[in-house]
Amino acid sequence: MDHDKVTISNLHRQVMFTSDDVGKYKVNILKKKIYKINKKSKVKTYRVKAEYKNLGKILKQYDVIVDGTDNFKAKFLLNKFSLKYKKKLIIGAISKFEGHIFTFDFNLKKSPCLKCFYQGEPAEGVLDCETDGILGSTAVITGSLQANEVLKAILNVGKNLNSHILIIDLLNLKFRKVLFRKRKGCICENI
């Protein structure tokens, strides 16, 4: 799901695109590239913006929701609908040299949500690709670890990050796994 077209500013951090893709819709390019990798793939694309009016209808159909958005408004909407439909949600966020990965399984009563960690939505422009800048390797490493969480969720193997955030600090080459719990009064308190 993406309504956006490839721009020059995407190329250093969104490695599936090349300069030949600039000006074309991201979902169309990705679908073609996935088919080149595996012709038997089943890919359904949505060339729409992640908004309240369309997310409920779309997310209902899937077991695992993967966030690759670049804004917190969309992340919190994905959180809300994943919680509502009791989906697994894997979120990635990046800024400069730092990446964050969350895994939520809303079938588990103890699972916190994104609002438990941030205690509300960050101000507009916080962790914004356009203003903060993103190191390409930060996006690739965070995305790879996020993909690993997705595979574990689909295959139901290994230990996932539920109730934790993985903080990736590439400037100092440190990885921290931090526990956090449901926050009293949060939207997830009564699930």
Label every PLM stretch briefly.
Residues 1-191:
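Adenine nucleotide-associated cytosolic modules
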